[in-house]
Amino acid sequence: MIRPCFLVIDHEFPDSISTRKLVLETAKYNVITAYSANEAVATFRMFPNVSGIVMNEAVTGTDCGSLVNELRAIRSDILLIVTSSRGPTDCVVADHQLNNFDPAALLNLLRKLVPNPLEHYLSE
């Protein structure tokens, strides 16, 4: 079985992306990272078969809605979760919106939407 893989897009701040990455990798998900809108689009073109995208609504280089539309132009059915430190955002084109500071909510949502068949097996 193959573990699900996510593209995580965020600012290049200490701890911001590493926390999400650590949470996802601890749950046995694979993670690819991007630190700007341009890098996100280029990375998604290179790896269009990721299981989903987790992005910060204030990613550098563009506004949230524009980036979501650009990513969906590459693959229209991609699962897209937006996180924000301001709570619910105006990025309504995303599939789901979560608070930046609630990694448990992100993990619970991903476990529900994209179950990892290896998570239980690998944790034994």
Predicted ranges, named:
Residues A37, V50-R75:
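Conserved phosphotransfer microenvironments
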Residues F13-I32:
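Two-component/phosphorelay signaling modules centered on CheY-like receiver
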Residues E39-A42:
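Short alpha-helical segment
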Residues I2-R3:
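Phosphate-coordination loops involved in phosphoryl transfer and adenosine-cofactor binding
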Residues D10, N56, L79-S85:
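Short beta-strand elements of ligand-binding domains
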Residues T83-E124:
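Output/docking surface of receiver
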Residues I9-H11, A34, I53:
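Conserved sequence signature across two-component system core domains
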